[in-house]
């Protein structure tokens, strides 16, 4: 529970608002004979991946998007995976799709992601689309960074001119996060920190916004946070079988805004996966 004065960055409530909007937009597309379709490629029987995929298709049902599932055995070859990707690239009912990660170790994840048609890249992580983001060109945006920006705006956290410290340089959050936040529409100043950063607390104490995306339990503590700063908790790890974020509980006593984990960024990642698919279908009518 957040103490008095600390505002919860509520991802679930914000997701529900997005779903109301998406349901109306999908209904218009359906009237035009263009119901969007989200595809998923799931390899193997990892329980976490299965749960994520189930959740994505449940979200589709809520807003009227068609679901296209391709569930493959764990011992599939790279060539067989390529065939599935090629089939979805050519499938007119599939507006956009994702390859659920991680893949089994014998498969080349980068090769699989690069094989996705950039025009059907629901995750916004194809190298072509990341390049378009660098160039400031329209393309599907990475879902988690886009969700974080939306969440901050929804709760009136000032972004323009803010000093944002991003902890973590992964391709799904850390690296593209800086690209989104330094666009002219956001105009933040970003410091990207990682395992090689010297004196991380000295940097985080300067930050107006901290985005923690590392997967190290409770690594961001109250003494690292400037009073009143916004703290976004993205990282997920398991401690004694329980999902745990990167942000320690005592941060709630100092920060002005904090995203819970779970229940903060995760729901928006899924919401913007659907948003990307709807926007891809809408762009065909433009």
Swiss-Prot record:
Pfam families in the cross-refs: THF_DHG_CYH, THF_DHG_CYH_C
Keywords, alphabetical: Amino-acid biosynthesis, Histidine biosynthesis, Hydrolase, Methionine biosynthesis, Multifunctional enzyme, NADP, One-carbon metabolism, Oxidoreductase, Purine biosynthesis
Keyword Amino-acid biosynthesis belongs to the record: yes
GO biological process: L-histidine biosynthetic process; methionine biosynthetic process; purine nucleotide biosynthetic process; tetrahydrofolate interconversion
Residues where NADP(+) binds: 168-170, 195, 236
GO CC terms of this entry: cytosol
UniProt family annotation: Belongs to the tetrahydrofolate dehydrogenase/cyclohydrolase family.
Annotated PANTHER family: C-1-TETRAHYDROFOLATE SYNTHASE, CYTOPLASMIC, C-1-TETRAHYDROFOLATE SYNTHASE, CYTOPLASMIC-RELATED
Job of this protein: Catalyzes the oxidation of 5,10-methylenetetrahydrofolate to 5,10-methenyltetrahydrofolate and then the hydrolysis of 5,10-methenyltetrahydrofolate to 10-formyltetrahydrofolate.
Protein name: Bifunctional protein FolD
Native source organism of the sequence: Mycolicibacterium fortuitum (Mycobacterium fortuitum)
């Amino acid at each position: 529970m957040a103490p008095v004065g600390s505002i919860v960055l509520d991802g679930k409530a914000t997701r529900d608002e997005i779903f109301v909007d998406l349901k109306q937009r999908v209904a218009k597309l359906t009237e035009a004979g263009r119901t969007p379709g989200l595809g998923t490629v799931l390899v193997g029987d990892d329980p976490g991946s299965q749960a994520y995929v189930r959740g994505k298709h449940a979200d589709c049902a809520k807003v009227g998007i068609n679901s296209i599932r391709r569930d493959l055995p764990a011992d599939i070859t790279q060539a067989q995976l390529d065939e599935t990707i090629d089939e979805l690239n050519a499938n007119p009912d599939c507006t956009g799709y994702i390859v659920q990660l991680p893949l089994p170790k014998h498969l080349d994840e980068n090769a699989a992601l690069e094989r996705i048609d950039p025009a059907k890249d629901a995750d916004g992580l194809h190298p072509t689309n990341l390049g378009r983001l660098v160039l400031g060109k329209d393309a599907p945006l990475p879902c988690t960074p886009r969700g974080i920006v939306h969440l901050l705006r929804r709760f009136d956290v000032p972004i323009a001119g803010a000093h944002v410290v991003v902890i973590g340089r992964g391709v799904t959050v850390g690296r593209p996060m800086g690209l989104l936040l330094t666009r002219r529409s956001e105009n933040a100043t970003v410091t990207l920190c990682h395992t090689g950063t010297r004196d991380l607390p000295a940097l985080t104490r300067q930050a107006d916004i901290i985005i923690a995306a590392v997967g190290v339990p409770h690594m961001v503590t109250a003494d690292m946070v400037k009073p009143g700063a916004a703290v976004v908790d993205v990282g997920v790890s398991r401690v004694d079988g329980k999902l745990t974020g990167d942000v320690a509980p005592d941060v709630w006593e100092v920060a002005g805004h904090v995203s819970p984990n779970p229940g903060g960024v995760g729901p928006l990642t899924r919401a913007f996966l659907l948003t990307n698919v709807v926007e891809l279908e809408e762009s065909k009518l433009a």
